[in-house]
């Protein structure tokens, strides 16, 4: 029993131990998992008495913590002793964020789970289930409406960020994919190359055979370099050629029978008359002159790439036998001597230059087998000769003849004043260029060469008979005789060959008297050109005030009335056949049809007799004394600049004057009062109808209290005048070079110079009113004085493009509204034309259907710009001021509003009203809205209906459309019309905005088909069509002419080794400065993909690779470097680079312009320091100090800040979203791409007010010291917070930089220029320029040496897709190194630059081996040395070679010298020679070089010290030179004369010496005792001989050189005194610097 009980007890104890172990293990695991959230609730958990587990777990949602947890609960589990076989007790306490229902639900779930897990440990499973439940119910508590709003906004922001991140990731993936694809392509390309290489090795012979058989021989023929007549484009791209098929220049001469083949091209060299040898490509023959025996060719001068004319004479002989006899040789030698005499004469002719003579450039003669060819290069004149005019055009009008005569006399007088006689003045030797300028050619030399070459050299002397009936008169009076005959021929339209000369009596009296003074038989009575210039024919006394001639009037003729039939033109004037001959209108044109006539004038359809094309000629009666005439001239000037396919072209304009008998009671033509005009004559120009005129007359007049004319600009009155012409052509080229430079000047506003316009308070109708008054006055005069008197009438003729079809008014009346596609196409073309004229800063202001024409191809042509102008805005205040003197404003019966611009039904409200509001180009858009409605609406039958409908449309509140227009078919039309007719101009669109609007349907298929195909092809770069297009593009043939001219301006053939040496010296000097700052040279890749964000103005030179990808050459060195820094994650670097940058050419098929730019950049990870900027500026200051030529120019430093510029723009009312556009406009203004008026027009298109523009100019024109500008800058701080913060930040940066520059010792003037705009889109922070003012072509112009700034924000734009990390600070400067080259080259004292230190010369061929070994030793020792390749050169040739290459030392190696070498020195213009052992040569040369370098360093240090002492940074005078401050240098002057001098003479010589050497002494002065001057009475050549004296050695060597000197020169006694004095100064006194000065020749040399 006992044993049984014991057994039974052990059996019960085993499960008990198993429970406790399992419980302990679970508790340990839970504690490890939950850590601090686990709590054992047993009071004595580790006591001896074992209790069942009772724990508490604090549970949260699974995987969450912190702010994301909104719910939690505590799980209490109390286990029985037999757990886990028995379910434990479960409780949930301290629940947060859970409702009671949720807690009960969770508890029920736990109880069910516990039952299922019975028999297994389950607390962890229960806890995990609780956490899962909490995760599902983890929701934030309800929030307030404000919190929900903020949360929603945060979510939206987060969504946007996610979307942006997604797009960025997509772009990154695309970039990475493209990178990977290109890597694969590179691998495939390598494989293909290997395979292709193997194939080429196998089939090389077959390939060569195929290539030879398929090669096109025609492709190797050289094309003609110079072609004949080129097409002249007229109108809408239509080409017309001259009737003769030749260029205007070719028609100067008769056809050349012996014209060479088009492929011939000879190269000629000219030396006579030119300082440098000229190389010329001889082109095709353009004519010959039998009288002068010459042939004329076109030619191209290679150095400048300019066209010239080549006049060629051939002196021919025929040999009687195989060899020349002595007599024949003597005759040939005689001819050669005559040609040499002609060359001597020609040397003086090339110096002649006058606007009315053709310049000679060079002459050359060359001997061939049986002839001598003489060539003369002359100026190329684009025009015709008067002989051609005589043969084709007949008589020259009197007015034009007067102009020709005055210019001929001016040129002839210039020749005579220079003792040059023309000898053969005739119609063929007078040219007239395109501007009407007369130029005399073939003077003097042509007659002489013609006489030499006229007959065979060996022909026997015989009597010659002249074919001319006129005697030949010689001398200057003979030129006047021939001038009279020429003028008589021009007036008659044919050559005058009778003798004695008879002057027709029907010529004007003053012209008859003028001709008598020219062709009188007695030479003594014949007037000179100077006397003839004062004749009354040249200087007439006009009855009416004459109009000032301008370029527009250069083709002006005497007036002659048109010959329109009387039934078409009732007011046609009377004319005679003689008067008709003087009219350019009748000479050049044939009348076809009267197109229209009205108050403003008549429009006539004519045909040009020369080209056969039809034109429309507008004939306008004018009064030359009126202000309105000046206005018309200005308008014609403006209109001539327009060239667009949708604008009527204006070709020529001229004035004709005619005196006719005035019939009493008859008004002048086109001056009939409007009330008397019949409907047929008082209409308008082409296409108008009587019905339209009546409609306009019935239109209600607008409310108007003053003349509706406008002022020239927002801040100028209406009388502001703009100069007519800008600079001359050379200045334009010079300005273009400046614009194409490394950078442009700062914003320096200047007066515009585009036109000479005074826009007065007159318009078309007020002008008619004035004409009516003139007519009334004339009528009154006739009543008082009924006799017939001569009356002068002036007409302006304007030659315009002729539109054959109709006007838009005709098209509207024919039912345009039915053809919707045509309607939209025409509307788009009108918008294109308006956008063009608005871009040019002009306003039409009279836009209506009758002023919009349609050509034969049904394309729009906007015309009738009679009231167009190009001013910025108009204010009514100016109108009222100007109205005061012009009388009362009325409506005239023609339907127009007098004083009103445009027609009442189309004029915009701001023009029509009387308020003081400004208007701009949008007035045309309002008129277009009315026009577009008429295009879209059915033709209105009656005038009253049209007036009513259009007035309803002009309602100020909103347009009121007719009921039958308000349907679904016109939805887009209504939207466009409502937008255009908005009475608020700010809300009205511009033409460009409307073109880009979605309201306009896409272009029609016939217009856009090609563009669509191209767009589709370019969009699919992997398609077959794209590859085919690229293949065709790269298969283009390049002609030899294009190949030659492509880089002709770069390869000019004028290479100079000295220029290259100077460039190398400058570069080495600049690099030395950079290296002192720790910079390293770093060059970036040449090509970049096209980047529109960086280069927005298409200023980069773009190219296309074989795949069609657009790449660009570097515009500057900054952008490629920023890209390089970004891609390589560079944080700290100082680099310099001297590389080429490129500018695109305006002309096609030209090599991009190359400029050499030097860049210096500092990249640092320090972001809050201004020291890098100051160091960059200081570096440029150091470079200036290295070059004396730059120190003399007095450079100033201009600073600005991009934030300060932004603050100014914001302060001036410019919206922040338009800042980028304003930067572009200001930058274009700085680079002079836009005139000031164009800038104003572009600002106006941005809807900026005139007040904003005035404030802007007020700020950007400010510059000065920081202290002086601080009040102006501080005035911005008082503005809104954003502007104030920008100003404070920028002001602090400017103060820091200015302070650092002072600490660094920068002595240049530092100024703040608020108008400095230098690549603002690229820079962020300080920007700066180094600028000086220099005098160029009689005007002071700014010259920029360097410019730069901070560009931190440019680097992130080039970062890769996966690049992270800080962005460094970067500051850089660009230096126009070409300007430094030019400054050093143009120094008064030329800089000595040598290509090597020593030249090794072998004396004889046997010594060449020794010379080679010696040169190798010099190279090894680090001495730059050259070896003379030609050992046979003479001593003179050797010296010339050393002089040309500026080599100082020469080593002569000869076997006769044994182991010695002769070393010749050419230092300081003296020659010395010394024998040195060959083994000691290296040491000897190095010692010489060290001495030379030390002397140069001492001289440079002395100059630098002087410059630092005297440099004050002040602008001393207009030339930009520094004033020399400090102590005046007064050295010891010794005057040594051959005879005794008086005290006054000696004093005069001393003053002369000190004045002459003042500047040089100031630069060399260190101590007064170390500089002395010896003034002697010797010539310049003798002074140079003293440089051979050797005073550095002992006395014996000095005496030896003195004996050598005296043996070569006379006056030995005086020379011995000079040598003794030199010995006393240099040897005994040991004076370091001695000036040997010749007061006879004012010449000196320095003896160091």
From Swiss-Prot:
Residues 1-26, 661-784 are annotated as: Disordered. This is eIF-2-alpha kinase GCN2. GO terms for biological process: adaptive immune response; cellular response to amino acid starvation; cellular response to cold; cellular response to starvation; cellular response to UV; defense response to virus; DNA damage checkpoint signaling; endoplasmic reticulum unfolded protein response. The modification Phosphoserine is found at residue 230. Homodimer; homodimerization is important for kinase activation by uncharged tRNAs. Interacts with GCN1; this interaction stimulates EIF2AK4/GCN2 kinase activity and is impaired by IMPACT upon a variety of stress conditions, such as amino acid depletion, UV-C irradiation, proteasome inhibitor treatment and glucose deprivation. Interacts with DNAJC3; this interaction inhibits EIF2AK4/GCN2 kinase activity during endoplasmic reticulum (ER), hypothermic and amino acid-starving stress conditions. Interacts with MAP3K20; activates EIF2AK4/GCN2 kinase activity in response to moderate ribotoxic stress. The modification Phosphothreonine is found at residues 666, 869, 898, 903. Residues 775-784 have a biased composition (Basic and acidic residues). Belongs to the protein kinase superfamily. Ser/Thr protein kinase family. GCN2 subfamily. The keyword Transit peptide does not apply. It is found in: Cytoplasm. It comes from Mus musculus (Mouse). The lineage of its organism: Eukaryota, Metazoa, Chordata, Craniata, Vertebrata.
């Amino acid at each position: 029993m006992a044993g049984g009980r014991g057994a039974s007890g052990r059996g019960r104890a085993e499960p008990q131990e198993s429970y406790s172990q399992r419980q302990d293990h679970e508790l340990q695991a839970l504690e490890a998992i939950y850590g601090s959230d686990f709590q054992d609730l047993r009071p004595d958990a580790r006591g001896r008495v074992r209790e069942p587990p009772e724990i508490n777990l604090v549970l949260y949602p699974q995987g969450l913590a912190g702010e994301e947890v909104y719910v939690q609960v505590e799980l209490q589990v109390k286990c029985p002793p037999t757990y886990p076989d028995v379910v434990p007790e479960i409780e949930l306490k301290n629940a947060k964020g859970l409702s009671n229902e949720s807690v009960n639900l969770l508890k029920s779930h736990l109880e069910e789970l516990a039952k299922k897990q019975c028999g297994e440990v389950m607390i962890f499973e229960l806890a995990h289930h609780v956490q899962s439940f909490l995760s599902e119910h983890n929701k934030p508590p309800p929030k307030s409406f404000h919190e929900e709003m903020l949360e929603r906004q945060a979510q939206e922001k987060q969504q946007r960020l996610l979307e942006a991140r997604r797009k960025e990731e997509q772009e990154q993936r695309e970039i990475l994919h493209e990178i990977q694809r290109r890597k694969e392509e590179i691998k495939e390309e390598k494989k293909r190359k290997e395979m292709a290489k193997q194939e080429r090795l196998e089939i090389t012979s077959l390939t060569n055979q195929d290539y030879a058989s398929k090669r096109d021989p025609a492709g190797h023929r050289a094309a003609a370099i110079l072609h004949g007549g080129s097409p002249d484009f007229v109108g809408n791209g239509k080409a017309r050629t001259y009737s003769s098929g030749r260029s205007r220049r070719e028609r100067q001469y008769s056809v050349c029978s012996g014209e060479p083949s088009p492929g011939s091209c000879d190269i000629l060299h000219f030396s006579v008359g030119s300082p440098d040898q000229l190389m010329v490509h001889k082109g095709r023959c353009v004519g010959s002159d039998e009288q002068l025996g010459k042939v004329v060719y076109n030619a191209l001068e290679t150095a400048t790439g300019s066209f010239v004319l080549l006049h060629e004479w051939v002196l021919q002989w025929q040999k009687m036998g195989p060899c020349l006899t002595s007599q024949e040789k003597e005759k040939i030698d005689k001819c050669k001597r005559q040609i040499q005499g002609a060359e001597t004469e020609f040397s003086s002719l090339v110096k002649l230059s006058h606007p009315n003579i053709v310049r000679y450039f060079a002459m050359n003669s060359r001997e061939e087998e049986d002839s001598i060819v003489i060539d003369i290069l002359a100026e190329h004149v684009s025009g015709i000769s008067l002989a051609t005019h005589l043969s084709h055009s007949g008589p020259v009008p009197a007015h034009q003849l007067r102009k020709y005569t005055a210019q001929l006399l001016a040129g002839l007088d210039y020749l005579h004043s220079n003792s040059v006689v023309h000898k053969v003045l005739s119609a063929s030797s007078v040219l007239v260029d395109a501007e009407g300028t007369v130029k005399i050619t073939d003077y003097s030399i042509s007659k002489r060469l013609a006489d030499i070459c006229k007959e065979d050299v060996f022909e026997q002397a015989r009597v010659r008979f002249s074919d001319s009936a006129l005697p030949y008169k010689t001398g200057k009076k003979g030129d006047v005789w021939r001038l009279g005959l020429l003028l008589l021929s021009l007036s008659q339209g044919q050559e005058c060959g009778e003798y004695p000369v008879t002057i027709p009596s029907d010529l004007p009296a003053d012209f008859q008297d003028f001709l008598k003074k020219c062709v009188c038989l007695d030479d003594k009575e014949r007037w000179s050109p100077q006397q003839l210039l004062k004749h009354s024919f040249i200087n007439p006394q006009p009855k009416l005030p004459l109009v000032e001639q301008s370029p527009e009037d250069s083709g002006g003729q005497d007036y002659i009335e048109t010959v329109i039939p009387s039934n078409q033109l009732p007011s046609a004037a009377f004319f005679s056949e003689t008067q008709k001959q003087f009219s350019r209108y009748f000479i050049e044109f044939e009348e076809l049809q009267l197109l229209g006539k009205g108050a403003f004038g008549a429009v006539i359809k004519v045909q040009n007799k020369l080209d056969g094309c039809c034109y429309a000629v507008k004939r306008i009666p004018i009064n030359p004394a009126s202000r309105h005439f000046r206005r018309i001239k200005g308008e014609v000037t403006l209109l001539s600049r327009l060239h667009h396919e949708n604008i009527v072209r204006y070709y020529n304009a001229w004035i004709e004057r005619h005196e006719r008998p005035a019939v009493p009671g008859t008004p002048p033509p086109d001056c009939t009062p409007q009330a008397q005009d019949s409907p047929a004559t008082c209409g308008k120009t082409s296409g108008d109808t009587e019905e339209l005129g009546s409609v306009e007359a019935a239109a209600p007049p607008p409310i108007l209290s003053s003349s509706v004319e406008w002022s020239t600009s927002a801040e100028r009155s209406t009388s502001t005048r703009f100069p007519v012409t800008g600079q001359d052509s050379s200045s334009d080229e010079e300005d273009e070079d400046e614009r194409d430079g490394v950078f442009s000047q700062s914003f320096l506003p200047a007066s515009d110079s585009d036109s000479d316009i005074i826009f007065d308070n007159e318009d078309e109708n007020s002008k008619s009113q004035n004409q009516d008054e003139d007519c009334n006055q004339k009528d009154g005069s006739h009543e008082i004085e009924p006799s017939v008197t001569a009356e002068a009438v002036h007409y302006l003729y304007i030659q315009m493009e002729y539109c054959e079809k109709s006007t838009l008014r005709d098209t509207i009346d024919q039912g345009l509204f039915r053809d919707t596609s045509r309607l939209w196409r025409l509307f788009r073309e009108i918008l294109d034309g308006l956008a063009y004229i608005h871009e040019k800063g002009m306003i039409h202001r009279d836009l209506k259907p009758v002023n919009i024409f349609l050509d034969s191809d049904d394309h729009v042509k906007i015309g009738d710009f009679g009231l167009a102008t190009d001013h910025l805005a108009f204010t009514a205040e100016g109108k009222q001021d100007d109205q005061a003197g012009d009388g009362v404003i009325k409506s005239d019966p023609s339907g127009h509003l007098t004083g009103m611009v445009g027609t009442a039904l189309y004029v915009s409200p701001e023009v029509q009203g009387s308020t003081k509001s400004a208007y701009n180009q949008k007035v045309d858009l309002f008129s277009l809205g009315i026009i577009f409605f008429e295009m879209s609406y059915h033709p209105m039958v009656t005038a009253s209906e049209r007036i009513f409908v259009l007035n309803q449309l002009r309602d100020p509140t909103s347009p009121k459309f007719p009921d039958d227009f308000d349907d679904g078919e016109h939805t887009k039309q209504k939207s466009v019309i409502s937008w255009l007719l908005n009475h608020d101009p700010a809300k009205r669109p511009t033409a460009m905005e409307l073109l880009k609007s979605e309201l306009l349907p896409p272009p029609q298929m016939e217009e856009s088909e090609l563009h669509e195909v191209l767009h589709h092809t370019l969009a699919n770069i992997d398609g077959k069509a794209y590859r085919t297009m690229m293949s065709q593009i790269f298969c283009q043939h390049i002609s030899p002419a294009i190949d030659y001219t492509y880089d002709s301006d770069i390869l000019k053939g004028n290479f100079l080794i000295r220029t290259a040496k100077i460039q190398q010296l400058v570069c080495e000097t600049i690099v030395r400065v950079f290296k002192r700052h720790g910079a390293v040279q770093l060059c970036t890749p040449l090509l970049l993909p096209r980047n529109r964000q960086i280069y927005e103005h298409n200023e980069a030179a773009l190219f296309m690779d074989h795949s069609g990808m657009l790449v660009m050459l570097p515009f500057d060195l900054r952008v490629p470097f920023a890209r390089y820094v970004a891609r390589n994650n560079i944080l700290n670097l100082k680099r310099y680079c001297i590389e080429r940058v490129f500018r695109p050419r305006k002309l096609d098929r030209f090599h991009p312009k190359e400029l050499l730019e030097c860049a210096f950049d500092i990249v640092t990870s320090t972001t809050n320091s201004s020291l890098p900027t100051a160091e960059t500026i200081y570096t440029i200051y150091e470079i200036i100090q290295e070059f004396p030529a730059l120190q003399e120019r007095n450079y100033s430093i201009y600073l600005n800040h991009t934030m300060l510029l932004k603050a100014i723009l914001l302060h001036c009312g410019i919206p922040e979203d338009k800042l980028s556009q304003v930067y572009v406009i200001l930058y274009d203004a700085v680079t002079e791409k836009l005139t000031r008026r164009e800038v104003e027009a572009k600002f106006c298109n941005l809807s900026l007010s005139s007040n904003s523009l005035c404030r802007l100019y007020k700020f950007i024109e400010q510059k000065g010291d920081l202290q002086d500008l601080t009040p102006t800058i501080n005035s911005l701080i008082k503005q809104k917070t954003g502007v104030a913060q920008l100003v404070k930040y920028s002001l602090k940066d400017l103060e820091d930089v200015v302070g650092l520059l002072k600490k660094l010792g920068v002595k240049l003037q530092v100024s703040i220029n608020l108008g400095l705009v230098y690549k603002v889109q690229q820079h962020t922070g300080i920007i700066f320029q180094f600028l000086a003012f220099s005098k160029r072509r009689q005007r002071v112009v700014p010259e920029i040496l360097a410019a730069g700034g901070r560009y931190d924000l440019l680097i992130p734009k080039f970062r890769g897709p996966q690049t992270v990390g800080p962005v460094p600070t970067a500051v850089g400067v660009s230096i126009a190194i070409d300007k430094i080259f030019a400054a050093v080259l143009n120094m008064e004292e030329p800089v000595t630059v040598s290509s090597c230190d020593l030249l090794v010369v072998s004396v004889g061929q046997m010594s060449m081996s020794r010379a080679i070994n010696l040169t190798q030793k010099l190279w090894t020792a680090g001495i730059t040395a050259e070896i003379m390749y030609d050992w046979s050169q003479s001593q003179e040739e050797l010296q010339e070679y050393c002089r040309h290459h500026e080599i100082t030392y020469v080593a002569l190696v000869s076997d006769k010298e044994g182991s010695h070498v002769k070393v010749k020195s050419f230092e300081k213009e003296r020659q010395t020679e010394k024998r040195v052992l060959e083994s000691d040569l290296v040491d000897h040369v190095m010692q010489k070089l060290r001495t030379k370098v030390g002397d140069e360093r001492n001289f440079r240090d002395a100059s630098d010290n002087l410059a630092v002492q005297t440099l004050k940074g002040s602008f001393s005078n207009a030339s930009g030179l520094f004033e020399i401050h400090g102590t005046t240098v007064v050295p010891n002057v010794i005057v040594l004369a051959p005879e005794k001098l008086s005290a006054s003479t000696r004093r005069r010589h001393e003053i002369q010496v000190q004045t002459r050497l003042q500047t040089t002494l100031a630069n060399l002065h260190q101590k007064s005792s170390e500089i002395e001057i010896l003034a002697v009475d010797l010539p310049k050549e003798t002074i140079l001989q003293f440089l051979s004296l050797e005073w550095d050695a002992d006395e014996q060597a000095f005496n030896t050189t003195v004996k050598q000197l005296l043996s070569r020169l006379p006056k030995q006694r005086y020379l011995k005194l000079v040598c003794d004095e030199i010995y006393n100064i240099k040897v005994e006194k040991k004076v370091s610097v001695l000036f040997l000065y010749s007061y006879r020749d004012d010449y000196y040399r320095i003896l160091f």
